[in-house]
Every structure is written in C-alpha cells, then in structure tokens.
Amino acid sequence: MESLNQFVNSLAPKLSHWRRDFHHYAESGWVEFRTATLVAEELHQLGYSLALGREVVNESSRMGLPDEFTLQREFERARQQGALAQWIAAFEGGFTGIVATLDTGRPGPVMAFRVDMDALDLSEEQDVSHRPYRDGFASCNAGMMHACGHDGHTAIGLGLAHTLKQFESGLHGVIKLIFQPAEEGTRGARAMVDAGVVDDVDYFTAVHIGTGVPAGTVVCGSDNFMATTKFDAHFTGTAAHAGAKPEDGHNALLAAAQATLALHAIAPHSEGASRVNVGVMQAGSGRNVVPASALLKVETRGASDVINQYVFDRAQQAIQGAATMYGVGVETRLMGAATASSPSPQWVAWLQSQAAQVAGVNQAIERVEAPAGSEDATLMMARVQQHQGQASYVVFGTQLAAGHHNEKFDFDEQVLAIAVETLARTALNFPWTRGI
C-alpha cells in the first residue's frame, strides 16, 4: 500500500488546481455559493455524509450578512459561473456552511478539522508581476479576492478529505470536516457554533497558512489571536437648511466625529494589549444640509476577553455620550465577534509530534509572540473546551508575495501538501483506544 507521504504528494496537482479555481472565482462572506457547491460535490463523491446550509448555520446568529439584493445578485452570479445545480439550493440566502462526517463504525472520539472558504472585499492586482494575474487565475469577480489564503484552506480541507478516506481503515471514531463561511470580519463561526456543529467534538483543529510564519515552520498552538467585537453605529439626527435654519438641525455628522475622537482616546488596559479602530465614517447628504444621518464602522480588540469587553464598554459609553451631546439618536448593531485563543496543551503537544514527522517541516513549535489579529474559530475552540474537549489552532508557515489583505497577496503552494499530511497524521496516528 502506498505511504501517506506518497499519496499526499500525488494529490499536489489537485491541491493546486482547487486552490487556483477557488482563487479565480473568489467569493466573499455569506456568498460562497459556487465554492460551497464544488466542495459539497467533492465530499459527496468521496462518500462523506453531508450536512449543509441551514442544517449547520443558525439563521439568527449570522453577523454582517449582505442585504437581500446582494445575496440574490451573487447567487445568480454563482450560477452563471458554474455553481452546481444539485447543491446550490441548500446554500441560497447566505447559508454557505458545510459539515462532512466520516463515521468509521469503530469506537473512538470525534475529531474535527475546520477550514474557512471566504474571500475579502478587495480588488486584486492586475499586473504581470503578480503570479495569479500572470498565470490566469486572478479573481474574475470585481471587489472580491482571496487575499488571506482561504482558497488554500479550502483546498487543504478537500485534500484532507481525500487522504482520510484513502486511509480510512486506520481510523477510529468519527471525523468531521467543517467548511466555514464568512470568517473575514469574524462573522461566520458563531452561527455554526449555535447550530451545534462542534457540540460532540472531542478534538478540534483549525487551520491557517502564512501570518508571517516562515516556510517550514508549523505553529501548533497559536494563542496570539485577540478577542474582538465588530459593530456599526448608526446616528440619526434632524436635517435642516444649513444657512437659513441651522438651529433646527441635529447634526449626526458632528456626533459621529466626536464619537470617533473619543473612541481613539480610550485608555489602554494595564493587563494587556487593547485596540480600537473606526475604519469607516459616512455622513451627510448635501453641502447645504445639516447632516441627519451618520454611520461608523468600528472594531475593538483585546488580548483577553476581559480586555476586549473593557474597550467595548468604554466605546459604547463614548458613542452614547456623543449622541447625547448633539441631541441625536444612535443605534449599534453587532457585525462580528471572536474570543481570545487558548489552545489545549496536550492537543498542542500531539500536533507538534505529528508535524515534526512531515517532510518539509523544519520546526514544529508551540507558539509565536507576534499578535495575529483576530479569528472566529476561537469560538469553536471555546465551545469544544466547554464540553471538556481539546482544541488548537495551527498555522503553517509559507513564503508570501505580499502581506495578508493586500491586493498582491499570493503564497507558495507547497504548503498545501505539508498541511494535508500533518493533519492526516494527527488523525491516523492518534491513539484511539486510550486518547491523549
């Protein structure tokens, strides 16, 4: 029987093909319709049991959902770009989640692996110096680009599905492969958690590539993700003639501006790093009109859930105070959230032991010091740990052409096979009878 390494290496062309296809047809959060249908078909052909759409995505827990017009427009766009008719109805309306299950029929725990599928709202570089453009797989969808590696993550998930099915006789218990929508903006994981997809999981691993980790290094217990809350603040004032009757107006723009300054003046927390950022401010309707509406798009972050909550609470106070100062109303809407990461030490050690055996891995380390933004797979990790399971977040280093969320982002595709083999070893070599 061919070895695990030989089999994974034989998948390398497919891994590259999948990654480039997903890259070319990039789809951002909650509209990954084409991507989801291709993933579902591949998993179905392998014999996995599938739970799709509303079965694995809680409707009321979705955050940052596009409006109905956008959802329908992107649904039609996906159909025109080759979304598979036999699957697409399951995902209509922004329910683009998939859970594939392989039940071996042999006693053992439930082991889950999570990858994300969404692209960013970003226009890709259109220059021959950019490999995806030069080689013909740059995004064909305006304003949507895989600039964080999720195309690679989806390919890794499919490669892992093929590998575990090939070596199924060496497995025990149940394998769950989770394909998550809308990670960008930390919008999608909570809806899958609230649908119960990880409630039965004993061992959980989430996956990312890059993030500044050098090629050949695998970080097996990334604990540097910050807790975060994303929200919009809508200010509502009263319009008036700016020249004739300015005193009749209540200026929403000034309230939003005052709130912005106050937000960026929130004192840091003594127990760890904190962040606040107003990324967007939109206001007004005309030069000679007292602005009656304004919008702020805001995020808070903290090295711990406690610190993030501190910043968020102060932010709400600042926003309410600014609204009161200018006599306007304000409403905030939650758009995304994630907790800080806290990997399980025993599971991290097991992941390290398996990554160290993979060709192309120079070092398998526990953690890195540099902050890595935020990631909503931490919500899945936390739920698994609440149920006495173990969880971790693994980062596979790779050479990047440009940083994450940059229009020139690209990565060395050799990392795909390294990730597949590492994750497969994690399951295939697991001591099913005694656990860890």
Swiss-Prot record:
Its cofactor is Mn(2+). One of its GO terms (biological process) is folic acid catabolic process. It comes from the Bacteria. It is an enzyme of class 3 (hydrolase). Keywords: Hydrolase. GO terms for molecular function: dipeptidase activity; para-aminobenzoyl-glutamate hydrolase activity; protein heterodimerization activity. One of its GO terms (cellular component) is cytoplasm. Disulfide bonds: none annotated. Induction: Could be transcriptionally regulated by AbgR. PANTHER family: PEPTIDASE M20 (PTHR30575), PEPTIDASE M20 DIMERISATION DOMAIN-CONTAINING PROTEIN (PTHR30575:SF3). Belongs to the peptidase M20 family. Component of the p-aminobenzoyl-glutamate hydrolase multicomponent enzyme system which catalyzes the cleavage of p-aminobenzoyl-glutamate (PABA-GLU) to form p-aminobenzoate (PABA) and glutamate. AbgAB does not degrade dipeptides and the physiological role of abgABT should be clarified. This is p-aminobenzoyl-glutamate hydrolase subunit A. It comes from Escherichia coli (strain K12). The gene is abgA.
